[in-house]
Amino acid sequence: MEEGTAMRKGGWWLALGMFSASALATCPDWPLARGRQETSRLHQQIVAWKEAYWRQGASGVSDDVYDQLTLRLAQWRQCFPGATPEDDDLPPPTGDARHPVAHTGVRKLADEDSVARWMKNKSDLWIQPKVDGVAVTLVYRQGRLVQAISRGDGLRGEAWTARARQIPALAKVMTGELADSVLQGELFLRRDGHVQQQTGGMNARAKVAGLMMRADAAAALSQLDVFIWAWPDGPSDMRRRQQLLAQAGFKYSGQYTHPVSRIEQVAQWRQRWYRSPLPFVSDGVIVREGREPPGRVWSPGKGEWLAAWKYPPASRVMQVRAIRFSIGRSGRLNVVAELEPQRLDDKRVQRVNVGSVSRWQMLDIGVGDQLQISLAGQGIPRVDAVVWRTAERHKPTPPPAKFNALTCYFATPECSEQFLSRLIWLSSKSALNVDGVGENLWRVIQQQNPMTHIFSWLALTVEQLQAVPGISAARGQHLWHQFDLVRKRPFIRWVLAMGIPVPQGALAQLESENWHLLAAKSEAQWRTLPGVGEIRARQLVAFLHHPDVVALAQWLSGQRIPGF
C-alpha cells in the first residue's frame, strides 16, 4: 500500500523506526560548510524527483532508491543543522476532492522483533500482502461509482473518477451493503506470476501513477486492477467483509487476507509471498486488526491498528568511504570501493569490486558518492548504479600499471598482492579445489612461512602448518592432508592453477596432454583448438616458454606431480 508514495508527500511521514543505525551509520567526515552544501544539493534533487512524480507520474529513480536517499537526507540534516529548512518539502498536489474517510497511511516496522512487539496484546489480526501501486478511494452511492480520488495528502486528492470508470476491472455498480460504501485500496499493475524475490519492484508505483495521469492511456488502463484493503465503517467481521467484497468482484483482498495470531505465522506468510508467484508487485506485508475505529476518526499518520513489514531490499544505497586499488592474478589493476557497512539479505557488505580502472572512470565513482549495491550470483556484491555524486569530487590517482599475466609467480615485496591473488585462484574450485583454504589462510601462512613461489606450500610439513597462528594441531594435520591430496589432481588442473590462457572450449582436448607436449606446440597447432585465434595462440606459446613458468614446471616435476 502506497507507503513509498507517502514518503514523497513530505518528510513528516517517514517512520522513525526506519531511521536506524544499521541502515544509516555515522555522519560524513565533512566540514560544516561542505556538509550543508551536499545536504542542500541532495534535498534539491529529491524535491525535483518528487515534483516529477507528482506532476508527470515520472520516476527518476526506483522507489527503493528514492526512499533510501530520503532517509539519507534526514540523517544529513541531523549531521549538518541548518542545511535546509525542515518544512520546505514540496507538498503533494492535494486536488479539490475531499476523501469521505481520510487515508491513514501505514507505519513501517523495521524487523521481526518490532512486529512481534506491535502484535503483543492485540487480537483479531489479519495479514495481507503490501501491494505496490497507488492508493485510491472509491465512493459508491445508491449502487453507483460516483467518485474515485487519489490519495493526495490523505485528506484531499485529485478527482480520478473519469479515469477510474475506464478501468475494466473496477466495479461500476454495487448492491447490498456495498451500494453506499467508501472503499480504500491500491490500484496496481496486473502481473502474471510476479515473483518479488526474483524480479523486484519494477517501479510499479510510478507506472500506475503515470497511467492515471496520462490523457492518452485509456487502452492501457485495462492493465490495472484494484486491491481493496479497507472498508471504513463496513462489517466488523473480517470474514464477512472479505466475502462481500469477493462477491462484488473485488477478488484479491479475500484471496490474500489471512488470520494470524503469532509472529511465526506472519514471518511464514511474508516469506511465502516474497518467493511465490503473485498477480501483482508487492513490497512487504501488512498486519492489521480486524476491528477498526469509526471512519470519522481516521487521520493521516494515525493508523495505529495496522503496520507494515517490508521485504528485504533487493539493493541498498551505500556511501563510498574510500577507493583503493588491488592487483588480480592476471596483473590487472582492479578498483575496490570501501563502503559504509550495511546488511543486504543475510550478508554484511562493506566493500564492492568496481572492476577495471576504465570502468571505474566511466562510472565516475568518488569518495562520498552513493552507490546502489545488490548481490549477484553466490552473494557477491555488485554496483548497479551511482545514484548520487557529491559536489566535491575526491578520486585517488591509480598507481602505474606494471604487472601482467606473467608476473609474480615468485614472491617479492612489490608482488605481494598479485602473488596472493594467484594463491587464492589456485586453491579455488575452478583450479585445484583445496578444501577449506582461502584468502585469510594464505595470508597467515605467508606471514609465518614465507613462500618462494606459488606452489611452495606443497613442501610445508605438518609441524610448520601447526605452528601457524590460529591453526590448531588438528587443523594443521587436516590442511597437510588436503595439500597432499591435491598432488593427485589431474594435470589439466595444475596448468589451470598456473594460469594457462586456454579457452574453456579447448580444455577437454588437453586432458590427455603433458607438459612437454604442450610446450612443443607451435602457434599454428594451438590455433587448431576451439576458441584459439592468432592472439591467444601467441599468448599460449609465450606462457609455456616464460622462464618463471618453466621453473615452476620443473619444480612440480621434482614433486612428482602428474604430467610434469
UniProtKB/Swiss-Prot annotation:
Belongs to the NAD-dependent DNA ligase family. LigB subfamily. The active site is at 130 (n6-amp-lysine intermediate). InterPro entries: DNA_ligase_B, DNAligase_adenylation, DNAligase_N, NA-bd_OB-fold, NAD_dep_DNA_ligaseB, NAD_DNA_ligase_OB, RuvA_2-like. GO terms for molecular function: DNA ligase (NAD+) activity. This is DNA ligase B. Keywords: DNA damage, DNA repair, DNA replication, Ligase, NAD. Its EC number is 6.5.1.2. It catalyses: NAD(+) + (deoxyribonucleotide)n-3'-hydroxyl + 5'-phospho-(deoxyribonucleotide)m = (deoxyribonucleotide)n+m + AMP + beta-nicotinamide D-nucleotide. GO terms for biological process: DNA repair; DNA replication. Catalyzes the formation of phosphodiester linkages between 5'-phosphoryl and 3'-hydroxyl groups in double-stranded DNA using NAD as a coenzyme and as the energy source for the reaction. Signal peptide: none annotated.
